[in-house]
Amino acid sequence: MIELPVVPSASDRKSKPDWLRVKLPIGKEYTKLRALVDEHKLHTICQSGNCPNMGECWGAGTATFMILGNVCTRSCSFCAVATGRPTEYDIDEPKRVAEAVRLMNVKHCVITSVNRDELKDKGAEVWYQTVVRVKEESPQTTIETLIPDVKSDWASLERMISGGQEVVSHNMETVERLYRRVRPQAKYSRSLEEIQRIKAFGKRTKSGIMLGLGETKDEVLKAMDDLVAHGLDVLTLGQYLQPTKMHLEVAEFIHPDQFAEYKEIGLSKGLNYVESGPLVRSSYHAEKHI
């Protein structure tokens, strides 16, 4: 569910191709946004996931907020977000996120969360209240919510996505064959059904897959077919990078030309929009995905 992690290990850094090298985040807008995030004690996936686009996005005054804490109940083998037993969530978080969005004058807001499997509603009420508060404080702001696997709790899913957001995203992360290794607590078929349910609720649907984990081209194309069949509108494809030596190693660095080909194939299969490139992450150019 969580957006793709992006900080390479020491060995990974030595062999990383030039097209994956990015500038350090700097600039007035980045500094201003960092101060606001710290002041309001907010979590961003930009920081927790060590996103390579943080400088570009924060420099433009945009960010992806992570609600329900920064400790996840899942232990996906690719993800840089901390895993463990989360503390109690902050009931004032919806208010603080909404205030930060208003102060930052965000035009398009992306909200995501860790998995909170220990909560009866999977955090659905906090999700709902956060979206509602953002809309109240900033009615002109459009919202994308990148939601977790709800383990077939469809009542909680409905509450989670009924706050007025324009786009609802749920990341597949990888191809079916690699699920047990990459997302051991998730199921490929269940995530597909979640996307189908989101579409049935009338939302614009979005998902992301990371490449370079050992998948084949045929497997990527099958995943595209499965997603189209389950009602997906927008797909993001990006390069997996190993967060630490404790995480899955990179099997392959996918060339930018291959990403470009995947984009054309995805569009030909019926997807409305495909964002595909080595540095693409779920929230990258999210304002274009409405």
Curated annotation (Swiss-Prot):
E.C. code = 2.8.1.8
The catalysed reaction is:
[[Fe-S] cluster scaffold protein carrying a second [4Fe-4S](2+) cluster] + N(6)-octanoyl-L-lysyl-[protein] + 2 oxidized [2Fe-2S]-[ferredoxin] + 2 S-adenosyl-L-methionine + 4 H(+) = [[Fe-S] cluster scaffold protein] + N(6)-[(R)-dihydrolipoyl]-L-lysyl-[protein] + 4 Fe(3+) + 2 hydrogen sulfide + 2 5'-deoxyadenosine + 2 L-methionine + 2 reduced [2Fe-2S]-[ferredoxin]
What's one GO MF term for it?
A: metal ion binding
GO CC term, one of those recorded: cytoplasm
Report the superkingdom from the record. Bacteria
The coiled-coil regions, if any, are: none
Q: According to its UniProt record, in which pathway does this protein act? A: Protein modification; protein lipoylation via endogenous pathway; protein N(6)-(lipoyl)lysine from octanoyl-[acyl-carrier-protein]: step 2/2
Residue positions binding [4Fe-4S] cluster 1: C46, C51, C57, S283
Q: Which residues form the signal peptide?
A: none
| UniProt-listed HAMAP family | Lipoyl_synth
Q: What is the name of the protein in this document?
A: Lipoyl synthase
Q: Which gene encodes it?
A: lipA
